[in-house]
């Protein structure tokens, strides 16, 4: 059954008024909220009632969602265009039941690789791994891009209070040399360990940064043997890793059944373990696993990722929402939006269904946002008074890691106030009367009142965590991962390929050749606009 059918449009005719819904139903919050361990999920401020939710859940039941969930967890190749299983969940699975993919029990492989990463982390932290000059490693530089950067960087920042190893962890991603230089300016070649995170070991940005880092190291040591003491790799291309000068004992696996944007649970998360210690890294995995079990075993009406996906898909299909705002009210989550942008938009930014047919309904949306309270002084104006339909997710943490309780209370008060303001707004009469009370005369009040009206009735969800710990962060990430999966099923698209990024890479290589040789075929085949841009650069 197609989720985005005409029946969803009729649901909009329920004309939900949130204020009225709360006034007439004192059980609304109880009905439209869920709890998973230390995560409270309040979706009562969404444009739904019992009838709409029942209809959405029926659509989920009639879809292939239950079967697709089983297929994913059992290792079926649901990434149909690349003929791959989708098993990032296996990386955090604490069960011992065999899981066979292409004739091999991958649980054994995963366990073995985890042990290798653990041994490396403990070796570096303890000082048993030394730089070429014999000095202890003090800094880790992770060189990667996309999923090899966004996830680990987000987690390392979010869990800063749990840093316990005395290692400073840096991230380099952009091909712009400034990204690399920012790291190199603050590290010592004798005490730095580089992680090259690239499945193909040929990703342009990662390879160029790695080569430059290698040159920087050798400028200091003037001995090729130094590379083995200062570089490890996460890749499936052993020949290229060896050619670079890295000992193959220090090359860690990336499997085809783990997509880059879901890879922080794998060896790609090595930089996380270097920062927070391997025991805390395992707690991150355990938190995600708890949500995997919740997602796999819980009926849809009480299943948080399913409800998240149904609401988002409903707004997309029925209200034509083209974006979603994600507003974490915690500075530690300052990279969370960046991370989820890739996870969501690269997964569901598709225009054909599984069969390769162009769809006639909207799929992925633009996910954007930023940390509170900063956003209140930047883009919240659009959320409150703009005429674009934008559902909002608020993420709040009940307790902080610091002792500034007055700061934390103010932060949470602002978060809850924003969701309340989106829901209730303020009417013309309310504003007009307030202006009269403030001392304005009737003419002045009438002139200003229309500008201060806030329509309200704008949907939001609040996700409240007891604390931001490795365990709870793992759970939070997994909630959104599974939400993305469910939306892909509802829209009948493949959430696990990303063919849209390939053309730009191909053209970028051609243009680079053209920039270096204006007699080349690549230059001759350029359009006039691109040729002029190249000319402008060369003339500077």
From Swiss-Prot:
It catalyses: alpha-D-glucose 6-phosphate = beta-D-fructose 6-phosphate. Pathway: Carbohydrate biosynthesis; gluconeogenesis; Carbohydrate degradation; glycolysis; D-glyceraldehyde 3-phosphate and glycerone phosphate from D-glucose: step 2/4. Keywords: Cytoplasm, Gluconeogenesis, Glycolysis, Isomerase. It comes from the Bacteria. GO terms for biological process: gluconeogenesis; glucose 6-phosphate metabolic process; glycolytic process. Pfam families: PGI. GO terms for molecular function: carbohydrate derivative binding; glucose-6-phosphate isomerase activity; monosaccharide binding. It is found in: Cytoplasm. GO terms for cellular component: cytosol. Its main location: cytoplasm. The active site is at 346 (proton donor), 377, 505. Belongs to the GPI family. NCBIfam families: PRK00179.1 (NF001211). Catalyzes the reversible isomerization of glucose-6-phosphate to fructose-6-phosphate. This is Glucose-6-phosphate isomerase. It comes from Francisella tularensis subsp. tularensis (strain SCHU S4 / Schu 4). The lineage of its organism: Bacteria, Pseudomonadati, Pseudomonadota, Gammaproteobacteria, Thiotrichales.
